Amino acid sequence: MAASSRAQVLSLYRAMLRESKRFSAYNYRTYAVRRIRDAFRENKNVKDPVEIQTLVNKAKRDLGVIRRQVHIGQLYSTDKLIIENRDMPRT
């Protein structure tokens, strides 16, 4: 993979993770982060430049979807789950 293409993929990976961590819902947040990591690990050995570009374009579309869903989730936020409350003492 060319250096510029590698930098582009890493930048896209970081942007997707960063944006996914903004989901207000715990389940969406953990699923999105896990799915992004799995997808990038699955495709880390791809060498064909055409296939890499196809995957990058798909990831850019997915990043747009994540941004849109994060925004919608913030409009209709819900209470935090018990698992998210770290201030509560454990018994």
Curated annotation (Swiss-Prot):
GO terms for molecular function: protein homodimerization activity; structural molecule activity. Pathway: Cofactor biosynthesis; iron-sulfur cluster biosynthesis. GO terms for biological process: [2Fe-2S] cluster assembly; [4Fe-4S] cluster assembly; iron-sulfur cluster assembly. Keywords: Disease variant, Mitochondrion, Nucleus, Primary mitochondrial disease. Pantetheine 4'-phosphate binds at R6, K44. Reduced mRNA levels in Friedreich ataxia patients. One of its GO terms (cellular component) is mitochondrial matrix. Pfam families: Complex1_LYR. CDD domains: Complex1_LYR_LYRM4 (cd20264). Its main location: mitochondrion. Coiled coil: none annotated. It is found in: Mitochondrion; Nucleus. Belongs to the complex I LYR family. It is linked to Combined oxidative phosphorylation deficiency 19: A mitochondrial disorder characterized by respiratory distress, hypotonia, and severe lactic acidosis in the newborn period. Other features include gastroesophageal reflux and elevated liver enzymes with normal synthetic function. Homodimer. Component of the mitochondrial core iron-sulfur cluster (ISC) complex composed of NFS1, LYRM4, NDUFAB1, ISCU, FXN, and FDX2; this complex is a heterohexamer containing two copies of each monomer. Component of the cyteine desulfurase complex composed of NFS1, LYRM4 and NDUFAB1; this complex contributes to the stability and cysteine desulfurase activity of NFS1. Interacts with FXN; this interaction is nickel-dependent. Forms a complex with the cytoplasmic form of NFS1; this complex increases the stability and cysteine desulfurase activity of NFS1. Interacts with NFS1. Stabilizing factor, of the core iron-sulfur cluster (ISC) assembly complex, that regulates, in association with NDUFAB1, the stability and the cysteine desulfurase activity of NFS1 and participates in the [2Fe-2S] clusters assembly on the scaffolding protein ISCU. The core iron-sulfur cluster (ISC) assembly complex is involved in the de novo synthesis of a [2Fe-2S] cluster, the first step of the mitochondrial iron-sulfur protein biogenesis. This is LYR motif-containing protein 4. It comes from Homo sapiens. The gene is LYRM4.
